[in-house]
UniProtKB/Swiss-Prot annotation:
It comes from Bos taurus (Bovine). NAD(+) binds at residues 53-58, 100, 139. The keyword Phosphoprotein applies. The gene is LDHB. This is L-lactate dehydrogenase B chain. The modification N6-acetyllysine is found at residues 7, 58, 119, 329. The modification Phosphoserine is found at residue 44.
Amino acid sequence: MATLKEKLIAPVAEEETRIPNNKITVVGVGQVGMACAISILGKSLTDELALVDVLEDKLKGEMMDLQHGSLFLQTPKIVADKDYSVTANSKIVVVTAGVRQQEGESRLNLVQRNVNVFKFIIPQIVKYSPDCIIIVVSNPVDILTYVTWKLSGLPKHRVIGSGCNLDSARFRYLMAEKLGIHPSSCHGWILGEHGDSSVAVWSGVNVAGVSLQELNPEMGTDNDSENWKEVHKMVVESAYEVIKLKGYTNWAIGLSVADLIESMLKNLSRIHPVSTMVKGMYGIENEVFLSLPCILNARGLTSVINQKLKDEEVAQLKKSADTLWGIQKDLKDL
């Protein structure tokens, strides 16, 4: 007796298990992981989304909640499991998992605890998707990108930190607000370490090719009567303010990560400020990861743009590199 499905649907091609073309995995289904997931789904970037976490109930609930939105999405398969076999054949894996900083905890201690988490996660990712590109989002992102690179054994063009992509987006938004234009028409770069010691490249800030520093030579300095330096200060403080107000940040970082993924999956060769291995650049001698303008395409992070930086900007980058190395050199089990 034929089933309803057999009566309804007459097959033309043989059924086969298909390997997904553009599978994306998100590791960690906390606020940031789920913001990444919904941003990826909203841009229709993937034909299969896999979620992984250690909290099974939360994981299943998030998966079901997204699956129930399938009618409104163009992603035919959404899966989740605590077992990493669910991530097999991923093109891109986004790592948002990690432990949170406790009150009064040193960064070194926080990093070491996250190293212990990553020692489990990273080998599993590489086991099931040996050809993937890994995007690290967990903080402190520059150090954990280095940790991921070391643990994964992947070439450096396939291990990328979300880095200053969000810092630069915040910078362009705040500048554009002051000027009354859209952020996409206000060009500016935040480089270096994601967060407190990031570097604003004032010499490169422009609108329609007009250098703003040529109009106001004091821009970004302490002598500036218009106090544009405050914009960079606001970029650095904005995450803390959002955390103070709502407890965490998630939407902007989720959108920022989807933006990076789009450049890679669509082979766009767009340029983003993301965290990459900078040894040998700007006189940096250690294996540290910092954000520089990088070309992202289907192969991963394929090139770095040589920006003309001023001496004090290079000095700031070197200082960040030294700070990061100071923590990295004491990490155990890498």
